[in-house]
Amino acid sequence: MDDKRRLILDQALALVDERGLAAMSMRAVAERVGLTSMALYPYVGGKDALLDGLVDLLHLELGTSVGDDLAEFGWRERLRALGRAVRSLAHAHPSAFPLLLNRSAAGASASWLTAALRGILHDAGVPASAIPRLARMICAFLLGYTTGEVTGGLPRVPPDPESAPDPASEAADAAAREAEFDADLADLITLVAHAAPHPADDRT
């Protein structure tokens, strides 16, 4: 990615992190990088293209966070690590993250997550004909669950209306959410294993 384009996208993402997606405009981003709005166009195009660029940047960040270190691990651990990386990305960029669900085909790196999932499913021994469907299903869960989590769209246990906010209760809720997500990942791993006629060993 061009250095100037990367700088602009980094600043656009920082703006969204600080002030929300509604605050992002060409003018606001231009001010952060010391340019005019028109000067952004050669690097990121218009606002729609800028949003696509944010999707690209988020996928790049996800790929970097997972890295190549998992290549030596089995498919189960790789799927678990990928799921947790998606969730960490959602919590790091809660305002921008829903773009991955709403603009899933955008950006030059937008196929990274699907490609990573397909590689894991292949290594698990899933038949080639079943890989696209399973990859879409797992991708939909990872992006849908985490988007709901950071936007407040997931159902949660209602607090006692007569109780004051309890930080300990909030921490417990966060821990329960994490445990639920890990349990869901375990269920997905079991589903993948059942989809493979001869499931690969963890070290495969």
Which role fits each region the language model picked out?
Residues 1-7, 13, 68, 197-204:
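Actinobacteria-biased recognition of intrinsically disordered, low-complexity terminal regions
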Residues 7, 11, 15-49, 53:
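Helix-turn-helix
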Residues 8-16, 54, 58, 86, ...:
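Short hydrophobic clusters on alpha-helical segments that form packing/core surfaces
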Residues 16, 51-58, 104, 109, ...:
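Alpha-helical DNA-contacting segments of helix-turn-helix folds
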Residues 64-103, 109, 128, 138:
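Hydrophobic alpha-helical connector segments
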Residues 113-146:
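A contiguous pocket-lining binding segment that forms or flanks enzyme active sites
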Residues 123, 151-204:
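C-terminal peripheral helix-coil segments that are non-catalytic and often amphipathic
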